[in-house]
Design a protein with these regions (language model features):
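Exported/extracytosolic protein signature
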Residues: 1-179
Length: 179
């Protein structure tokens, strides 16, 4: 006899591949059960970033477009979360998990993030997403009308600050007054 079992499939995506420090990333997991006439029982989702420096927030779980977040047991830490949905997934069902990640500090190298979907009666399936977190780069230019000033003379300076990395924004920057 051939043993039939349900099979989960998870796909993971983020809205961008490169984020700035301080920026929010928007992530979505898409989970289905692909075997005809089968049901995955008690679906569980684990999602973890391999490095620290971000904060996961605003987790929302839907089953067939219906918000089931309040029905789920969610254990969220800064760079990972576990969701026990308590729900089953049949062949025509779609479960989605949407969440936000605030990249709080510069992280060296690429940041791999792995999501795993499992249930009481299936093998686990996983998908990965890799992003890069770059700091903004500031260029500071100072100019004045005169090359030198006499003691007691007032001088007017213009300071121009520009951010050099494409599609990035510097937040809350300050610079010392150096003359």
């Amino acid at each position: 006899p051939i043993l039939k079992a349900p099979k989960l499939q998870i796909t993971k995506q983020s809205d961008k591949k490169v984020y700035a420090v301080g920026e929010t990333g928007y992530y979505k997991l898409h989970i289905t059960q692909g075997k005809e006439g089968m049901t995955a029982q008690n679906v569980k989702v684990v999602d973890e970033f391999e490095k620290e420096g971000m904060k996961v927030q605003k987790i929302e779980v839907k089953l067939n477009e219906k918000d089931i977040t309040s029905d789920c047991k969610i254990d969220a830490k800064d760079h990972q979360f576990t969701i026990e949905t308590g729900k089953d997934l049949g062949e025509n069902d779609v479960m989605t998990v949407a969440y936000q990640v605030v990249f709080e500090k510069r992280i060296e190298g690429a940041v791999k993030n792995t999501a795993v979907a499992g249930s009481d009666n299936t093998e686990d399936d996983q998908d990965e997403n890799t992003v890069v977190v770059k700091p903004p780069v500031l260029k500071i230019e100072k100019s004045t009308a005169h090359k030198s000033y006499k003691e007691g003379q007032s001088g007017e300076y213009k300071i121009r600050v520009t951010q050099r990395n494409e599609n990035m924004t510097a937040h809350h920057y300050s610079f010392p007054q150096c003359f």
